[in-house]
């Protein structure tokens, strides 16, 4: 389509147009709304529908499973299907499921409806992430996304406790509907070969990102483990704090203010870019494991604040590096579009593991230890990728020296 090959915004690559990036960021933020507000949504289900803590974990875990499935659909389709049609289909599906949640409130129905709503969100979020990954500078694009994430998460965490459960559903429906108004800002197809060659001339060359397809797949596995950690921690942090006797008047504002630390994570990512993508990521994942695990010894006002504030900063910090790494390794966008899928799958597995631990009477302490250990698994996987890439670079340099 000719409107996708030319760019009136002045950028040589259509994916670098400010309108494309702005819309993709907004689309992704709408899709991630449930993921970033799970603590508040969990409490809303307990108070409004009298669901148990275990049921809450399974309901929102099902939403994230649907989110994962939707992103897989996007990944299989973004290279061949008109992306605008794909996004519109996801928006309609998500809006319909959220609307039905207001009328079908029993546990079994809620499980299926949250799964369906997740599918719709996953489809348009996966397409948005693939679009950001297709920019010439994915680090900048994902930093913009996560800067927006810090403000949208703070706003939603502040607003949602003031709304009824149906009010939250109306908010999700309305924000998805707004996305449809700007659909023409989204390129309908990926770059052609000529555009890819131009983009290759413009992109960062600090690493050799021409890697076997298995490496971005390993990256996706690592992202999944990172989000198993996030899912277990973030779903139950508010309920665990309340169970320990922490005042709701302390916990709720803390969640809101902690979300602004996502901004700090983005700024740190910019500062640390000089150290490459791998080393800062290792530090972030190790720190996340410690911050989650330390709550296993008991929750106080002080360690809750430290854990939440630092965790939110490191969440976005790690996401910038994980997403950018995928963007450089996979220019087609098919694997990048799977990022929301593995994030959602991790957010499905994490709450369900946590729910099983709590359901078996092992308590929140064991849950925090298990969740924190998942970040260490991700760190080991990235360590293997780093070792392969830099061993390959050393072998290549040695070969060039001998040839000379």
Report each predicted region and the residues it spans:
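Helix-to-loop junctions at the C-terminal end of transmembrane segments
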Residues: 70-83, 264-277, 358-359
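Intracellular juxtamembrane helix-capping segments at the cytosolic ends
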Residues: 123-136, 316-330
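C-terminal transmembrane helical hairpin of 12-TM major facilitator-type secondary transporters
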Residues: 276-322
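Helix-loop-helix hairpin linking two adjacent transmembrane segments in secondary transporters
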Residues: 143-191
């Amino acid at each position: 389509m000719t409107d996708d090959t030319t760019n009136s915004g002045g950028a040589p690559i259509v994916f670098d147009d400010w309108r494309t990036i702005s819309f993709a960021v907004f689309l992704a933020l709408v899709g991630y709304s449930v993921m970033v507000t799970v603590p508040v949504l969990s409490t809303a289900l307990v108070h409004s529908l009298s669901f148990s803590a275990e049921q809450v974990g399974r309901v929102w875990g099902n939403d994230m499973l649907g989110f994962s499935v939707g992103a897989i659909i996007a990944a299989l389709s973004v290279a061949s299907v008109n992306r605008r049609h794909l996004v519109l289909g996801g928006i309609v599906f998500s809006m319909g499921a959220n609307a039905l949640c207001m009328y079908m409130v029993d546990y079994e129905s809620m499980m299926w409806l949250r799964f369906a709503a997740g599918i719709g969100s996953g489809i348009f979020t996966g397409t948005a992430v693939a679009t950001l990954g297709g920019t010439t500078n994915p680090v900048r694009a994902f930093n913009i996304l996560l800067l927006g994430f810090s403000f949208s998460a703070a706003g939603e965490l502040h607003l949602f406790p003031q709304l009824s459960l149906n009010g939250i559903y109306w908010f999700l429906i309305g924000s998805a509907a707004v996305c449809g108004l700007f659909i023409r800002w989204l390129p309908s197809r990926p770059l052609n070969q000529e555009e890819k060659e131009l983009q290759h001339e413009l992109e960062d060359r600090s690493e050799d990102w021409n890697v076997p397809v298995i490496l971005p797949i390993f990256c996706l596995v690592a992202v999944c483990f990172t989000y198993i950690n996030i899912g277990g921690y973030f779903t139950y942090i508010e309920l665990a704090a309340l169970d320990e006797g922490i005042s709701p008047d302390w916990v709720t504002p803390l969640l809101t203010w902690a979300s602004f630390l996502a901004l700090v994570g983005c700024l740190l990512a910019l500062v640390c870019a000089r150290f490459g993508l791998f080393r800062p990521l290792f530090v972030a994942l190790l720190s996340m494991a410690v911050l989650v695990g330390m709550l296993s010894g008991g929750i106080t006002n002080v360690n809750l604040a430290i854990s939440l504030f630092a965790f939110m900063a490191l969440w976005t910090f790690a996401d910038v590096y994980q997403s950018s790494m995928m963007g450089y390794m996979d220019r087609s966008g098919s694997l990048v579009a799977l990022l929301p899928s593995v994030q959602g799958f991790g957010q499905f597995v994490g709450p369900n593991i946590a729910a099983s631990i709590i359901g078996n009477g092992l308590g929140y302490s064991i849950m925090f230890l298990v969740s924190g250990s998942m970040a260490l698994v991700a760190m080991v996987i990235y360590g293997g990728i780093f070792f392969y890439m830099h061993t390959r670079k050393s072998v290549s340099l040695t070969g060039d020296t001998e040839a000379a």
